[in-house]
């Protein structure tokens, strides 16, 4: 089943990547959707890895996860800084807003997502808003 979902999820991730790479005039970025516990962005190889469980959480959350990893590249390519700094969070919020998504954070990771009307559309298991 997961292999089928990876095949389903990858084109969605690639479309998001292409949109953001073109909008921000970034160097090419490769993207993989894998059966792994967490995702990452690797600057030297220009590779993003997205866990398939993020897709299984729903399309809005999957978009947010992919945009989170792409935010790392925008931040790095424009400021040469790594990690979850203020500029990174600004970029991530801007990208999410472009899809009508409003993040609610626990530190720098999502604990919930709302739509631009304020409706809760995703909540991490074990959390309240």
Where do the PLM segments sit?
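Metalloprotease/metallohydrolase-associated module, dominated by Zn2+-dependent proteases
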Residues: 1-60, 77-129
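Active-site recognition of the HExxH zinc-binding catalytic motif
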Residues: 64-76
